[in-house]
Regions:
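Bacterial N-terminal signal peptides that target proteins for export
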Residues: 1-11
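N-terminal signal peptide c-region/cleavage motif recognized by signal peptidases
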Residues: 17-19
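N-terminal ligand-binding lobe of clamshell/alpha-beta domains
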Residues: 22-377
Length: 377
């Protein structure tokens, strides 16, 4: 239950039996803020529906048991994930949903009515949260915010974030077990790359959400999938042109750079762009359709004549790896594409299946990536 400073002595007496199960702790979140609250938290608001990707790891038996509200984005951004969880945990369809901080549709009164012990927010929402005064407003009604991060600095902050959430949920041992798995799986790539004296790094262009819009082309600069590429032994083509984490590369620059490999992030975004050209990779994806749409994207002006297309070095991978604790799987798959000889024995699909077997309550379904064949002359 929430640590409420205005509780009367009589109310505290009534709550003694429940409070005995929790105690005040101080957590330092990834934003460097010290947050004091009672843990384990019994009532949690998720600032994003896709945060179930970490909640399910730490509370596998009942991942929605403590969730009293969440942002309505999982069903739109990853409908297959939503369906898989809804099939096993139908109660998720009854969880109240709310708008976002960034677009100003979050309802303070609704949050208060849900009586949460804590609200977990992604670090990228912090600026909008502060600008709108939500942090201060929620603090005044006794609802603390804890920031976590799998997106801005994923490889620094994923273990930290899982440890923080483990403290919130009273699942420290589970968080430590996951972090050990995470670090071991990352080391299967980074240790090999670090051991190479004269590594030839392929030039890799990563298109962010290719086909989502007609714009060409969103990409990753110094961070996120751009860092994934580098950790996997590649050179991020967009890094010199995009100083921030995300940005845009024009078609002429792609042609001039002539990357060795092209990777497009994708997902089923029918809810956002009905009938769009996006690549619908993800759990249970139709691989034939994904491959066909990926081939069609390579017919755009920025990709015609690029050597990677003719060589069959064109791939698509699940976009949601960019903002959840499973990012190590993407790094393994990128390493497999970028250095097949070095990672002949690495099986990212087996890694993802093991992740599901050990840490998730839903079954593994393949479909998270696809590749094109070389162009035959």
């Amino acid at each position: 239950m929430t640590l409420r400073y205005r509780l009367s002595a009589s109310a505290l007496t009534l709550l003694t039996a429940t409070a005995a199960l929790a105690e005040p702790i101080t957590i330092t979140d990834v934003a460097g803020r010290d947050v004091t609250l009672e843990a384990p938290a019994e009532r949690v608001i998720l600032g994003e529906g896709r945060q179930i990707f970490f909640a399910a790891v730490l509370d596998t038996e009942d991942p929605f048991g403590r969730i009293v509200g969440w942002r309505e984005d999982l069903q739109q951004a990853s409908p297959e994930s939503y369906a898989a969880y809804a099939e096993k945990f139908p109660e998720l369809t009854d969880i109240p949903t709310f708008g976002g901080f960034k677009d100003g549709t979050f309802d303070i009164e609704q949050a208060v009515a849900l009586d949460p012990d804590v609200m977990i927010m992604n670090l990228e929402a912090k600026a909008a949260t502060e600008e709108a005064g939500y942090e201060e407003k929620l603090a005044k009604v006794g609802i603390p915010i804890v920031y976590i991060d799998f997106r801005e600095q994923p490889f620094d902050n994923t273990p930290k974030s899982m440890e923080i959430i483990g403290q919130l949920f009273g699942a420290q041992d589970r968080a430590a077990e996951f972090n050990a798995f995470y670090e071991a799986q990352m080391a299967r790539v980074t240790d090999v790359i670090a051991a190479q004296e004269n590594l030839e790094r392929p030039l890799v262009f990563v298109e962010r959400a290719g086909g989502y819009s007609e714009e060409c082309c969103l990409s990753f600069g110094n961070g996120n999938f751009g860092t994934f590429v580098e950790l996997a032994g590649g050179e991020n083509m967009a890094k010199p042109f995009i100083p921030a984490t995300f940005g845009t590369i024009n078609a002429e620059q792609i042609i001039a750079s002539d990357p060795d490999q092209i990777v497009v992030t994708g997902g089923n975004w029918e809810a956002y762009v009905p009938g769009g050209d996006w690549i619908g990779v993800g759990p249970g994806a139709d691989m034939a359709e994904a491959k066909s749409k990926l081939a069609a994207l390579m017919q755009r002006p920025g990709f015609t004549g690029v050597a990677a297309v003719d060589a069959g070095e064109v791939h698509a991978i699940w976009h949601q790896f960019y903002n959840n604790p499973y990012s190590f799987v993407a790094v393994q798959q990128l390493a497999k594409w970028q250095h097949p000889d070095l990672f002949r024995d690495l099986d990212p699909e087996a890694t993802l299946a093991e992740l599901h077997d050990r840490f998730l309550p839903i079954d593994y379904r393949p479909g998270y990536w696809v590749s094109l064949d070389p162009v035959s002359n």
